[in-house]
């Protein structure tokens, strides 16, 4: 070792380990070798601190090292948390409820298409806490099974205290997601099992049903046949039970007859076999909407009564979502009876509802008191054989019964009863919607600033129908309506209509046309703003010119007064000078100042009186006290 550079003069001493009890190895561990050799130094062994003591000393001595140490510790902590969360999230199972929460924007869009609004917190509460208590098989994590959704929907739409109106938007939205699933729902939707039919339907026994028909709470519904070319019609068994959608007994409507023995229907297709009925009338109705339309005698599948392929009427109940939308998108009967009457009239004419459907429609859209008033007015409208309103209870109960009648809609007599019942119901709605006469309400209808005359006239006529017993379309009331139209129009239109020539011979249509011309010639808001600005500028200019004119007139008057004053002063001074000169005329050197004669002076004037001079009058001075 003496040849090693830099070690000349060093003392090399070999000492055993036992002589240095304070020697430590790495991290304070004892050394592994038996001994060691000190190459450089005085032979003393220095004790080096462990890494923990080194870090603490660096932390206390170096200020710059503190942020570095904190950053390292924070990075290690974040990395550990990230790895832990990634591992746990990867193990979380996806459920229908969590799927809807992850795609909440799509759920809100679906609810908006159904004309309803949903909230995320209530969505989670109903799905995980409320609907599992209905005992229909709803899991706490949700499901897209149409059968379970339909059962929950029936519970929600139950009438009376057992219903849940606040949950209607949520179950309707959930049903819409299952019926028309978005791409992220399709993997979770239960596929429909294919309907297997034997080649010869009459000779083989029917297939077992897929599920038992649930106990529902609306009205009975007979599933309609699905008439497509590849598959024959599937009608419910003629001996099977009807599905009850309310807690009441089913109406005595006749079941559809069995298929013809020859296996041919009216349209020449293969005779239907006894297939498995749908699990719910709502599911069958929605399924019928999703599939292609049937090529038979009818084109609508939404009517309660429609003609099936076998020549018999099929019953389709109202959709609960339709009833919900009708109720929430229209004013109440007390608020606007005309609008709700028009809605019910269109439903009665197009949907051809049965007696039970009419009761369901009235119970949904009207309150209890409104419904009783409508039924009372409808029974008053029943006419006897002489064509006048009758008071016979039997005739009234036959035409407009309050209990479920035995009317078969598959017979002409039953359909005639239903048509007459709908007409009486419509008359009751119209009579019950008439309010007591209140002309003040009619006078309170005025034309808005931007309302067209035609729209204003419609509102005015509606007020006449609602608050008066008069018909505004009656020619005898045209004069009253015309006067109201003129007086209650906008001020500019009313003034010009009052100045029309031959006003008394003008019809209401002529007045409306003139009002439309005046309305269309109105200036736009931009033109009105420009006109107001221009008028303001002109008014300001006129005011400024008037102020200048008044100032000039004031200056001119002041100048005139000053001129008069100066002229007066100058003339007074001139008069004073002229008066002084007259009092003291210039005398010659030999002229008498007393008699103005020449030849002597005033003291020698013979004309001057002689005698003692009287005392001079003393001038009195005024003091401040005087």
Curated annotation (Swiss-Prot):
SUPFAM superfamilies hit by this protein: Retroviral matrix proteins, Retrovirus capsid protein, N-terminal core domain, Retrovirus zinc finger-like domains
Keywords assigned by UniProt, alphabetized: Glycoprotein, Host cell membrane, Host membrane, Membrane, Metal-binding, Transmembrane, Transmembrane helix, Zinc, Zinc-finger
Membrane topology: Single-pass membrane protein
GO molecular function term, any single one: nucleic acid binding
Stretches that traverse the bilayer: 68-86
GO biological process: virion assembly
Biased composition (Pro residues): 199-212, 249-261
Comp. bias (Basic and acidic residues): 522-554, 574-607
Glycosylation positions in this chain: 113, 480
Post-translational modification: Glycosylated by host. Cleaved by host near the middle of the molecule, releasing the c-terminal half containing capsid and nucleoprotein domains op GAG.
Zinc fingers classed as CCHC-type: ranges: 590-607
Residue numbers spanned by region Disordered: 199-306, 522-626
InterPro entries in the cross-refs: G_retro_matrix, G_retro_matrix_sf, Gag_p12, Gag_P30, Retrov_capsid_N, Retroviral_Gag-Pol_poly, Retrovr_matrix, Znf_CCHC
Cytoplasmic side: 1-67
Extracellular membrane side: 87-626
Subcellular location, record wording: Host cell membrane
UniProt function note: Plays a role in viral particle release. Presumably acts by facilitating the fission of the virion bud at the cell surface. May prevent the antiviral activity of murine APOBEC3.
Record-given protein name: Glyco-Gag protein
Organism placement in taxonomy: Viruses, Riboviria, Pararnavirae, Artverviricota, Revtraviricetes
């Amino acid at each position: 070792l003496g040849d090693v550079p830099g070690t000349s003069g060093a003392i090399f001493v070999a000492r055993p380990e036992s002589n240095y009890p304070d020697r430590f190895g790495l991290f304070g561990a004892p050394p592994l070798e038996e001994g060691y050799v000190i190459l450089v130094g005085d032979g003393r062994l220095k004790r080096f601190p462990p890494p923990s003591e080194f870090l603490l000393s660096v932390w206390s001595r170096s200020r710059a090292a503190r942020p570095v140490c904190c950053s390292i510790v924070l990075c290690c902590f974040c990395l550990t948390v990230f790895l832990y969360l990634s591992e746990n999230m990867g193990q979380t199972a996806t459920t229908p409820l969590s799927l809807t929460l992850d795609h909440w924007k799509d759920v809100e869009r679906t609810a908006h298409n159904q004309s309803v609004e949903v909230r995320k917190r209530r969505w989670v509460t109903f799905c995980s806490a409320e609907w599992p208590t209905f005992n229909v098989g709803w899991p706490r994590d949700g499901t897209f099974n149409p059968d379970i959704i339909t059962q929950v929907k029936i519970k929600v739409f139950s009438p009376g205290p057992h219903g849940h109106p606040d949950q209607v938007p949520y179950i309707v939205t959930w049903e819409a997601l299952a019926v028309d699933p978005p791409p992220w729902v399709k993997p979770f939707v239960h596929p429909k099992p294919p309907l297997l039919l034997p080649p010869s339907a009459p000779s083989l026994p029917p297939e077992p049903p897929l599920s038992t028909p649930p106990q529902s709470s609306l009205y009975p519904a007979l599933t309609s046949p699905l008439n497509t070319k590849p598959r024959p019609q599937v009608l419910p068994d003629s001996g099977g039970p009807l599905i009850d959608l309310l807690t009441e007994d089913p109406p005595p409507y006749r079941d559809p007859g069995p298929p013809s023995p020859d296996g041919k229907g009216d349209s020449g297709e293969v005779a239907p076999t006894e297939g498995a009925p749908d699990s719910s009338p709502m599911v069958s109705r929605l399924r019928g909407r999703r599939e292609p339309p049937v090529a038979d005698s009818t084109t609508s599948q939404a009517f309660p009564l429609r003609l099936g392929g076998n020549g018999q009427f099929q019953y389709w109940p109202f959709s609960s979502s339709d009833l919900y939308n009708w109720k929430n998108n229209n004013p109440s009967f007390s608020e606007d009876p005309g609008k709700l009457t028009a809605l019910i009239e269109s439903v009665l004419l197009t949907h051809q509802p049965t007696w039970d459907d009419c009761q369901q429609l009235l119970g949904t859209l009207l309150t209890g008191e409104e419904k009783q008033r409508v039924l009372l007015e409808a029974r008053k409208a029943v006419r006897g054989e002489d064509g006048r309103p009758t008071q016979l209870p039997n005739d009234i109960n036959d035409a407009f019964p309050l209990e479920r009648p035995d009317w078969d809609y598959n017979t002409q007599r039953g359909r005639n009863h239903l048509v007459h019942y709908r007409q009486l119901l419509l008359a009751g709605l119209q009579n019950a919607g008439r309010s007591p006469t209140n002309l003040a309400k009619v006078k309170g209808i005025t034309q808005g600033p931007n309302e067209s005359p035609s729209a204003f006239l419609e509102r005015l006529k509606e007020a006449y129908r609602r608050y008066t017993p008069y018909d505004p379309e009656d020619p005898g009331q045209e004069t009253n309506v015309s006067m109201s139209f003129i007086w209650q129009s906008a001020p500019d239109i009313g003034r010009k209509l009052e100045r029309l020539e031959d006003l008394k011979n003008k019809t209401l249509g002529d007045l409306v046309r003139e009002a439309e011309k005046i309305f269309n010639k109105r200036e736009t808001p931009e033109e009105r703003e420009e006109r107001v600005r221009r008028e303001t500028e002109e008014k300001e200019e006129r005011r400024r010119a008037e102020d200048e004119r008044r100032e000039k007139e004031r200056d001119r008057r002041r100048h005139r007064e000053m001129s008069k004053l100066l002229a007066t002063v100058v003339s007074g001074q001139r008069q004073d000078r002229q008066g002084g000169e007259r009092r003291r005329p210039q005398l010659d050197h030999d002229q008498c100042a007393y008699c103005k004669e020449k030849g002597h002076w005033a003291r020698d004037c013979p004309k001057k009186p002689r005698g003692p001079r009287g005392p001079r009058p003393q001038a009195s001075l005024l003091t401040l006290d005087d």
